[in-house]
Amino acid sequence: MRLNTLSPAEGSKKAGKRLGRGIGSGLGKTGGRGHKGQKSRSGGGVRRGFEGGQMPLYRRLPKFGFTSRKAAITAEVRLSDLAKVEGGVVDLNTLKATNIIGIQIEFAKVILAGEVTTPVTVRGLRVTKGARAAIEAAGGKIEE
């Protein structure tokens, strides 16, 4: 076997439809679009969700909920990320300095994900119960 003798398995590569290439191809002239009508035209077709003039589903259903603006400026910090902070003191500014959270973040919460091995001091961040227990078990402390 050589590289120049390799070929794909029989039937695995299906040729694409060649539209408008004569009557004998079966896809000549109208190219499978039929005669006249909106869908036969170039650029023809209806927009997504259009139901022929009937009141569409997205307008029949009621509006609900909202997008919290606070969610965009809030971040979750994993326990395993705390080890990346130099100096052992973790607060909002040190997290931003080490690129663990973005500069636009104003609130952060430490969650129980991963492990913390070195003792760290968490200052001014919210901490879940499980994360609090893990930090204290590793010899760290939480300052409000």
Swiss-Prot record:
- Assigned protein family: Belongs to the universal ribosomal protein uL15 family.
Record-given protein name: Large ribosomal subunit protein uL15
Q: How is the quaternary structure described?
A: Part of the 50S ribosomal subunit.
Name a single GO biological process.
Answer: translation
The species this protein belongs to is Salmonella arizonae (strain ATCC BAA-731 / CDC346-86 / RSK2980)
Tell me one Pfam family matched here.
Ribosomal_L27A
The major lineage groups are:
Bacteria, Pseudomonadati, Pseudomonadota, Gammaproteobacteria, Enterobacterales
Domain of life the protein comes from: Bacteria
Which Gene3D superfamilies does UniProt cross-reference here? 3.100.10.10
